[in-house]
From Swiss-Prot:
Amino-acid biosynthesis as UniProt keyword: no
Gene name for this UniProt entry: efp
Biological or metabolic pathway of the protein: Protein biosynthesis; polypeptide chain elongation
Reported modifications of this chain: May be beta-lysylated on the epsilon-amino group of Lys-34 by the combined action of EpmA and EpmB, and then hydroxylated on the C5 position of the same residue by EpmC (if this protein is present). Lysylation is critical for the stimulatory effect of EF-P on peptide-bond formation. The lysylation moiety may extend toward the peptidyltransferase center and stabilize the terminal 3-CCA end of the tRNA. Hydroxylation of the C5 position on Lys-34 may allow additional potential stabilizing hydrogen-bond interactions with the P-tRNA.
High-level lineage: Bacteria, Pseudomonadati, Pseudomonadota, Gammaproteobacteria, Chromatiales
GO cellular component labels: cytoplasm
Designated name of the protein: Elongation factor P
GO BP field: peptide biosynthetic process
PANTHER family: ELONGATION FACTOR P, ELONGATION FACTOR P (EF-P) FAMILY PROTEIN
InterPro entries linked: Elong-fact-P_C, NA-bd_OB-fold, Rib_uL2_dom2, Transl_elong_fac_P/YeiP, Transl_elong_KOW-like, Transl_elong_P/YeiP_cen, Transl_elong_P/YeiP_CS, Transl_elongation_fac_P
Family the UniProt entry places it in: Belongs to the elongation factor P family.
Physiological role: Involved in peptide bond synthesis. Alleviates ribosome stalling that occurs when 3 or more consecutive Pro residues or the sequence PPG is present in a protein, possibly by augmenting the peptidyl transferase activity of the ribosome. Modification of Lys-34 is required for alleviation.
Matching NCBIfam families: efp, PRK00529.1
Keyword Cytoplasm assigned: yes
Amino acid sequence: MAQYSTNEFKGGLKIMLDGDPYTIVENEFVKPGKGQAFNRVKVRNLKTGKVIDRTFKSGESVEAADVLETEMQFLYSDGEFFHMMDPETFEQKAAPASAVGDAAKWLKEQAMCTVILWNDEPLTVEPPNFVELRVVETDPGVRGDTSGGGGKPATLETGAVVRVPLFIEEGELLKVDTRSGEYVGRVKG
């Protein structure tokens, strides 16, 4: 199995700790005036999502996590599982709702997602950075009602609620940033 030395640590690196796959969130190299240098690392458990702090001596080696990051197409959700398909092999996988988490509000059928697989099971599902979704419900914007920056909530076809400018109407197609949940612009269609 591949090993990573502490001097190879960087954000996003996948490692094994205590038999579980983790991803490095933050890495800080510390060289005290006295004593051995070390790495203070924040890691997220890919199975549970829990973030913990760990300290590694400088030069220590850690096993690489045998995880596969792949693009898959979201097919449908049956409430308990989100069904994904590999577009090349047409092989289907069922990701539990816990693996999808908050990404569920951005997933539309046929959308391509990044799926992290461990032991051939989906651990996490990340939506694309930008999605195009239709507005299904929003208050009508009243002309001249712009004091205070002007914005209103809009419910999208997946159930997500985003803040949009007053001129947005029901039925419009919007581009939304899934990382921040912010309105980016209209999609000309």
